[in-house]
Amino acid sequence: MEEKVEDDFLDLDAVPETPVFDCVMDIKPEADPTSLTVKSMGLQERRGSNVSLTLDMCTPGCNEEGFGYLVSPREESAHEYLLSASRVLRAEELHEKALDPFLLQAEFFEIPMNFVDPKEYDIPGLVRKNRYKTILPNPHSRVRLTSPDPEDPLSSYINANYIRGYNGEEKVYIATQGPIVSTVVDFWRMVWQERTPIIVMITNIEEMNEKCTEYWPEEQVVHDGVEITVQKVIHTEDYRLRLISLRRGTEERGLKHYWFTSWPDQKTPDRAPPLLHLVREVEEAAQQEGPHCSPIIVHCSAGIGRTGCFIATSICCQQLRREGVVDILKTTCQLRQDRGGMIQTCEQYQFVHHAMSLYEKQLSLQSSE
């Protein structure tokens, strides 16, 4: 069935253009799990001598070229920065900052990426479990699958992290990569294990290259003893909602799968209302689960860029409603503590600011009525 969502978010300002020398995370798929490279366009020219900054933004584990996880002053203080950085914005400050791409860019590059050194994982066969071989789950917060064989660490591995929510609440979300063929069963094992009521998918199946395998059935499939049945598909302008039932033995659960289709290929959206609508829909669905909702799974392709934008927007919307202020910098740092690289580019960081500026204006309009 086709439903139309009323566009009650007034997009008063277009998303400002990001300067062309923005840093772009260039993820290039290969036949097997893939690699990530970073193109730094004009970064050194803009900031002068910044060797440590270049090291932080480089692909982790690329020591052959003299970059990556080499010790630098920036890296030594990265953990402290992620724990302490904060910039509380009131309404007027938020609106001004959202329109200043140079200020946002400078702030973005101060935030350590907190990627994981691949050498931290010594698990044979791990390459088959990762879509991108340099985007790995931070060990302290990673999801561990229940395994019948404790001697086989690969069977408990999935590229996913628990993510804290508003006010540091534990395990509100799970950020994960888009499943590949070899991890579809693992993905559904995680859904069942974590009792997940909601999945948010923010990628197309292909965008020049494959970004995610189609891991849900047309009608019904069984994975690891869990019967997965699509009961209904609802099409809206910006997303598709699948109502799915999960059954194992006599236990049956409901699952809502939101597939956001309005994120354009290779860039960020030029309008914020579609994402704000999705955030609101997911919040309302989570509230229906009661005060102790199990983790919401969010994924794109690598599980850090668009995934980070969605989770940051959701957290910051809650903060604006409850406190009347927002701290996007602190939220980004919290996300990167839990999973490295969350909110992947300057352009995405700017988009989150624009979305929050728009959301604050909408809240102000509602309060004045």
Swiss-Prot record:
Tyrosine-protein phosphatase domain residues: 104-359
Positions annotated as active site in the UniProt record:
C300 (phosphocysteine intermediate)
On this chain, the residues bearing Phosphothreonine are T59
Query: Keyword set for this entry?
Result: Cytoplasm, Hydrolase, Phosphoprotein, Protein phosphatase
Q: Name one GO cellular component term.
A: perikaryon
Q: EC number(s)? A: 3.1.3.48
What molecular function terms (GO) are annotated for this protein? identical protein binding; phosphotyrosine residue binding; protein kinase binding; protein tyrosine phosphatase activity
Q: Name one GO biological process term.
A: positive regulation of receptor internalization
- Provide the free-text tissue specificity comment from this protein's UniProt record: Expressed in the central nervous system except in the cerebellum. Enriched within the striatum relative to other brain areas.
For this protein, the record's PANTHER family field holds: PROTEIN-TYROSINE-PHOSPHATASE, TYROSINE-PROTEIN PHOSPHATASE NON-RECEPTOR TYPE 5
Q: What is this protein called?
A: Tyrosine-protein phosphatase non-receptor type 5
Q: Can you name the source organism?
A: Rattus norvegicus (Rat)
Q: What is the lineage of its organism?
A: Eukaryota, Metazoa, Chordata, Craniata, Vertebrata
